[in-house]
Every structure is written in C-alpha cells, then in structure tokens.
Amino acid sequence: MKFEAFKIVPVGYIRKEKNVFIEILPEFREGMEGLREGDWIKLILWFHKSDTPELRRILKVHPHGNPENPLTGVFATRSPFRPNPYTVKVHKIEGNRIYIDWIDAEDGTPVSDIKIFPERYDCPKENYQSTSRLKS
C-alpha cells in the first residue's frame, strides 16, 4: 500500500487536567466565534499515537479487542487502528473553552477540525440503545 503524504494542521489539542477540554490554538480562536454554550459539535481528531505504517495497514480487527468477536473491517468499528487515524465525537460548548465530559483520546491528541452539529441534520439520539451482539 503506497501513501501520498499531505499536511493537516491541528487547530487545538485535547487536554486532560482537572477537567477535560479542547485547547484551541490562539491563531484559530477566531474560528470559535458563533459557537454558543450548549451547542453540539463534531470533533475530528488525529490518533497520533496510532500513526505508524504498520498500524495503518490493519484493515480488520476483533471489535473491542476481544478475539471472540469476528474479524470486522475497521470502517465498521471504533478501533483506533485505521488507514487514517481519525475519530469523531459529539460534545457541548460551555464558556470560552470547549469542555467535554470524556473522550476516547489521550492528553495532547491533535484536533484537526471542529464542525457545528445542526439538529436538523444530525440530531443526537439521547436514548440510543445498542443492538450490538459483540462482546466487550
């Protein structure tokens, strides 16, 4: 598999201190204008610690890392091992920082992009119940 390189510039980083939040870099803070407390957003992250040529070649995994689960294509899982290690999460905005309760990312994970999550297009399901038969 041959990869063509291109550059992605982080707009901020995940920070895990007393609270978990996204630290937006000063040169991108103007891009937060218009976001309000309580808005839902999508985050696009770069799993930088899963970014090696070997890990990018993994295209099938056992979901939840459990070998009892059948091998499944990474696009149908939440595995951090992907050809391009991105993930998307939904969070709320509170105050002048983007605070989040929890995220499946490490302190220092680069944030590549933030997009508004308009209810009419992408309404989150508050009471979602998984029908998955996979073992955790």
UniProtKB/Swiss-Prot annotation:
The keyword Signal does not apply. It comes from the Archaea. Belongs to the tRNA methyltransferase O family. Keywords: S-adenosyl-L-methionine. It holds the Pfam family TrmO_N. S-adenosyl-L-methionine binds at residues 48-49, 78, 106-109. Residues 8-126 form the TsaA-like domain. Gene3D superfamilies: YaeB-like. It comes from Pyrococcus horikoshii (strain ATCC 700860 / DSM 12428 / JCM 9974 / NBRC 100139 / OT-3). This is Probable S-adenosyl-L-methionine-binding protein PH1056.
